[in-house]
Amino acid sequence: MRKFNKMLSNKKFLDLDIIKESFDNYLSVGTSRSTKKLKTLHGSIAKDLEELLGKEYNIKSQGYRDDKEECIDGRYYNKKVDITIKNNGKSIAGLAIKFVMSNYSQNSNNYFENMLGETANLRSNSVPYFQIFIIFDKVPYYKSDGVLQKYDNISNHNLEKYLKLSDDDPKVYFHTPDKTLFILLSLKEISEEIKNKKDYIRCYKEIMNDEDLLSYSNKIDDLFGNSIILNNYEDFIKRMCALIIGYQKIKT
């Protein structure tokens, strides 16, 4: 673990400039479904993983080296993964990254169920699997025509399923990621009235270069159990690497 401490000593939190770039890309393309918005974020995390794990491991991701994702063999189906960790040419672990920027309450159950399913598929095939979930503490909710209906304010109450998941033992439950990083962010408040998605995009594009645009939020209490880490990227990435290396030693 000494090697890990040395290499990421100044990275307790994920670089907000990297997250800001992902947000800016989202505003530019106008949809959360585009893979472009997270390419820089994926690449930055992939680089950190390769530095920590060392030359024995190869990291595959959009935004890094050959700019390609890879599939990992699951128990029931093969899964294309955001970041794949390889050793001796074999895919041996995966990391999924989710950045929610709108309509959280509408899609929260789908996000959660999909995560449980893909995790169980890979972990039941002896593949360690990790998750990073990023969300603003105040998320716009749009109607189908783009009109802003409300804001979803993230609280401990609407994170109950994650709190419960955090107490699950990954050694017992295959649907539980080996480790999850939950990142909660605050966006600078806009004084102008925002009526629709176009207003939201325009207003935040105008202040994209403000130094105080993004910050880490303290609007929820850290009630998570052992399997979920709140905001501390350094702790998460070190634990992830330690688990991967430990698992490889057991297999060999």
Curated annotation (Swiss-Prot):
Official protein name in the record: Uncharacterized protein UU035
Organism lineage string: Bacteria, Bacillati, Mycoplasmatota, Mycoplasmoidales, Mycoplasmoidaceae
